Amino acid sequence: MLKSSSSLVAKSILRHQCKSMSELYKIHTLLITLGLSEEEPFVSQTLSFSALSSSGDVDYAYKFLSKLSDPPNYGWNFVIRGFSNSRNPEKSISVYIQMLRFGLLPDHMTYPFLMKSSSRLSNRKLGGSLHCSVVKSGLEWDLFICNTLIHMYGSFRDQASARKLFDEMPHKNLVTWNSILDAYAKSGDVVSARLVFDEMSERDVVTWSSMIDGYVKRGEYNKALEIFDQMMRMGSSKANEVTMVSVICACAHLGALNRGKTVHRYILDVHLPLTVILQTSLIDMYAKCGSIGDAWSVFYRASVKETDALMWNAIIGGLASHGFIRESLQLFHKMRESKIDPDEITFLCLLAACSHGGLVKEAWHFFKSLKESGAEPKSEHYACMVDVLSRAGLVKDAHDFISEMPIKPTGSMLGALLNGCINHGNLELAETVGKKLIELQPHNDGRYVGLANVYAINKQFRAARSMREAMEKKGVKKIAGHSILDLDGTRHRFIAHDKTHFHSDKIYAVLQLTGAWMNLDVDYDDQDNHCFCS
């Protein structure tokens, strides 16, 4: 019992809601001296705040729980949940094992977060073991657990197990349907995902977002936008950040600037919070759609305090891709002044900028800075350095750089070197690199074409023809390139030699007229002399 002289003060301390860990440390120390550190509601509040709060410390929660003379069951669930959301989800499994050693039985609130940890760890074996434990504990048809299991199997790309569980469930709710839809979408099976989507009698924003994201991840961007349009027409669900990021991504890949602007206006009209992720997506979309001014406008309006490395990367990379090389490098220095730490992608953007601008000295500086920052250069960083050197005509240096790399050269590295050799007239090295490329990627049509071009430039026409013969022998077919033009909201696709475009007669007529004005002796009806459209 509390002493009457201090009961009011003690009760006040026990009920105090902490707002920071430093405050919690002080109160905990005080209660230890008073012998009240295991009293409620301090125990439950301490475990809840330290394990689940964004400003908490789940390791502290675990230590606190372990030292209690009679740790409550809910405390174990709090700590397991906290670790499942942390940078160390494997610790939740350790807590679970210790819980079992104490003879405590997991309940319907324990398993879902253990399954979340197994998903984050990509541990299929662990997930299967947890499922077996659920069955043994008699919780196999708990709706919360079943929905989490479907989501877990989906994260493992195991649609079969997810579907089997879905079909066997005696009761389903909207979360169940969303879970199986997301499982199919994550695995890239958008056909099955769409069948589930069409079968659903009820949909919410998660449903629509999963279907849209599934199409985006499969590269079916037009279908993603069609689903979004359907969502808007039905009006039953308001799009959220996840929805809009996927929609913006689709616009970016399609180069659909007008559509992207419409989406941006929608975000503003419905007062959707312009989070860092949304702003970064908009910057990336505008840059990829050729409107660097709009990209800059989005970035400029953002408060520096609300930015992160990803947003700075998007605008730095966007400026560089549009030829604003010096501006992108200056912005990097501004980024450092703003106390935003660059990451590996930042240096990749900077190296790409140096490549476009022919800035060899600066590229070496950034490449060395990346190493000095403690990060290990990835394949993409090495590829950028090869591109920088090759574009600048330093093809021998690029070749030496590749030879001294601690990783094996990729097709993109050798491809950049090959282009540099061709552009700067080193045909001997070009032939050597071209042959290595074919060995590395024997089914890539572009590698044969690249070496054929080397032979043609060197007037070795027989060797050039042999490349086509080699392609035919290996069954490699040249994939026709295409261009896309967005005109007044309508997308026009142009492919070599094709005349299926609904205005092809008029287009060819204009080409003939243009050729005549330019005194070009070209027959646009001769497929051997031109590449055209559909």
Curated annotation (Swiss-Prot):
Residues 413-488 are annotated as: Type E motif. GO terms for biological process: RNA modification. Pfam families: E_motif (PF20431), PPR (PF01535), PPR_2 (PF13041), PPR_3 (PF13812). PROSITE patterns: PPR. The keyword Endoplasmic reticulum does not apply. Keywords: Repeat. One of its GO terms (molecular function) is RNA binding. PPR repeats lie at residues 41-71, 72-106, 107-141, 142-172, 173-203, 204-238, 240-274, 275-305, 308-342, 343-377, 378-408. It comes from the Eukaryota. NCBIfam families: PPR (TIGR00756). This is Pentatricopeptide repeat-containing protein At5g08305. It comes from Arabidopsis thaliana. The gene is PCMP-E105.
